[in-house]
Each structure stands twice: as C-alpha cells, then as structure tokens.
Amino acid sequence: MLNSHNRTEERSTEDIILEPYTYLISQPGKDIRAKLISAFDLWLHVPKDVLCVINKIIGMLHNASLMIDDVQDDSDLRRGVPVAHHIYGVPQTINTANYVIFLALQEVMKLNIPSMMQVCTEELINLHRGQGIELYWRDSLTCPTEEEYIDMVNNKTSGLLRLAVRLMQAASESDIDYTPLVNIIGIHFQVRDDYMNLQSTSYTNNKGFCEDLTEGKFSFPIIHAIRKDPSNRQLLNIISQKPTSIEVKKYALEVIRKAGSFEYVREFLRQKEAESLKEIKRLGGNPLLEKYIETIRVEATND
C-alpha cells in the first residue's frame, strides 16, 4: 500500500499547486465570455492562434477570480458543488488563484504585443478596485447609490470582458473601439445576475437559495428596495444578519417585491438591451451579439 509521501511523488508539483483550480474547472460554467469573444471576433478578425490564447487567458483570470470571490463571500456552492476552499482550505486556494493569475500574465507576455501588458494591468487594477469597494459596502453595511453600484460593476464585471475585447483590439487591424458596447453588456450581465440570484431556480441549485442575501451583498434590486423607503430598515437589518434561514430570506424577497424592485430591475434590463442593440446596429450589426441579447432577456414573472 502506498503511503501519502509516495502518492505525492507520483504527481508533479504543478499538479499539486493547481489542484484547487483543476477542481473548479472540472465543473463547467456557462462560458458566456467565450461566446462573447467569438461574437466580437466577427468584427475584429483576430488571428486564430492569438484568439485561442486570449480565450485561455480570460478563462484563467475568470476562474481564478471566482476562487477568490468564493473565499471573500464565504460561499458554500459554486456550479452546484462545494467551493474550492471547502475542499482544499483557504490558504491553498488563495495561493492557487494568485498563481493562475500570474500564469495568465505569462501567456500575455508570450504573445509579444507590448500594449497587451498595459491593458492587463489597467483592467486587473479596475477589477480589484471594484471588488474592494463592494467588500467595503458589505462589511461596513453601507448601502451604495445605484450610480455607485453601476460604477463598481463597470470596474469589476465589465472589466474582464473589457480586457478580452481590448486584448483582441490590440491584435486586430481594426481601429474601432468597442469598449462602450462592452460596458453596456457588462452592466446588463451583472444586474441580470443579481435579479436571477433572487428569482431563478437554476441559481438556487447552483449557488443556494438567494445566496446574495446570505452573503450580505448589496445587489441592484436590494439597493433599490432599501433606497425606495429609507425609513424601513427591515431589509437592511436582514442583510446585516447574513441570513441562512429560508423563511427569513422569503420574507426579504417579499419586502423587495412590495418595493417594486423586481419590476424596476426588469425595466432597467430592457433599457440596457435596447441600448446594446442600438450600439450594435451603429457598429454595423453583429448577428452573434444580437442572438446573445435575445437569449438573455428576462421575462416578466408574477411578482
């Protein structure tokens, strides 16, 4: 029978260091960013070998950021299975995530396009600024304004997609700047995610029931509900408790519904969809992006 020392020797150091990351990517995500990269390539015509590397870089950065997010949010589930740090511990998970970020930067350097490193640095700074202010709001129980929240989303959620498109632009002969469209799509993506977290059965199966409430997160519908009636502190108090009780979360959903926040969010999303389609048309049309917008529309529910 092999002892633990021998088993370690049979695996490479690289495999050991990457194990939390390998665990995460073994559970496939929605891969929306890869689909969007393909869609933007209809315009940018990036050389296939370079596009393959950009896809790899964005995938690495995305999954590394999820591992860190799950630690910072004290999450239980990711893609329907236990989060990496519940299997491998916080120290190893953080080290692995940081390691993967630097491996991704190494891939950028291999492409030997000087402007790409500057783009990566700028967007990784944006990502950490967005994450930092969101953590501050949660931990200090400070409810941001909608404008502050959208600014955070532009840094955090739009940042990775913007990084992908800016890397593609650096490798493309096109001189058209597509980042304004990317920002609209990124905002729509995050606000839709906030809505679905509180309303979708599939999100419950993958991340848990109304996980944003348990995380104490000021998401877009929660911000609207709190600011609609500042004198009613019930929702703010519930958020501060980071509830795990299903009944408490159901009550919070009722408070949000009565504030008209779900309908408000749906209207906001419809506006962003219209803005996206208008910008796509201005840029010459793109059937893949138009199809993407069509498939992510949020239909009205009975609330």
Swiss-Prot record:
Cofactor(s) demanded: Mg(2+)
A GO term, aspect molecular function: dimethylallyltranstransferase activity
InterPro entries documented for this protein: Isoprenoid_synthase_dom_sf, Polyprenyl_synt, Polyprenyl_synt_CS
Taxonomy, superkingdom: Eukaryota
Gene Ontology BP annotations: carotenoid biosynthetic process; farnesyl diphosphate biosynthetic process; geranyl diphosphate biosynthetic process; geranylgeranyl diphosphate biosynthetic process; isoprenoid metabolic process
EC numbers, comma separated: 2.5.1.-, 2.5.1.1, 2.5.1.29, 2.5.1.10
CDD domains: Trans_IPPS_HT (cd00685)
GO cellular component: cytoplasm
Sequence positions that bind isopentenyl diphosphate: 30, 33, 62, 79
Residues the entry annotates as binding Mg(2+) 1: 69, 73
Binding-site residues for Mg(2+) 2, renumbered to this chain: 69, 73
Binding site for dimethylallyl diphosphate: 78, 156-157, 190, 207, 217
Cofactor note: Binds 2 Mg(2+) ions per subunit.
Name of the top EC class for this enzyme: transferase
Alphabetized Pfam families for the sequence: polyprenyl_synt
Subcellular location: Cytoplasm
Keywords: Carotenoid biosynthesis, Cytoplasm, Isoprene biosynthesis, Magnesium, Metal-binding, Transferase
Primary subcellular site in the record, as a coarse category: cytoplasm
Reactions catalysed: isopentenyl diphosphate + dimethylallyl diphosphate = (2E)-geranyl diphosphate + diphosphate; isopentenyl diphosphate + (2E)-geranyl diphosphate = (2E,6E)-farnesyl diphosphate + diphosphate; isopentenyl diphosphate + (2E,6E)-farnesyl diphosphate = (2E,6E,10E)-geranylgeranyl diphosphate + diphosphate
Pathway: Isoprenoid biosynthesis; farnesyl diphosphate biosynthesis; farnesyl diphosphate from geranyl diphosphate and isopentenyl diphosphate: step 1/1; Isoprenoid biosynthesis; geranyl diphosphate biosynthesis; geranyl diphosphate from dimethylallyl diphosphate and isopentenyl diphosphate: step 1/1; Isoprenoid biosynthesis; geranylgeranyl diphosphate biosynthesis; geranylgeranyl diphosphate from farnesyl diphosphate and isopentenyl diphosphate: step 1/1
Induction, per UniProt: By blue light.
Stated family: Belongs to the FPP/GGPP synthase family.
Purpose of the protein: Catalyzes the trans-addition of the three molecules of IPP onto DMAPP to form geranylgeranyl pyrophosphate.
PANTHER family: GERANYLGERANYL PYROPHOSPHATE SYNTHASE
Protein name: Geranylgeranyl pyrophosphate synthase
Organism: Mucor circinelloides f. lusitanicus
Organism phylogeny: Eukaryota, Fungi, Fungi incertae sedis, Mucoromycota, Mucoromycotina
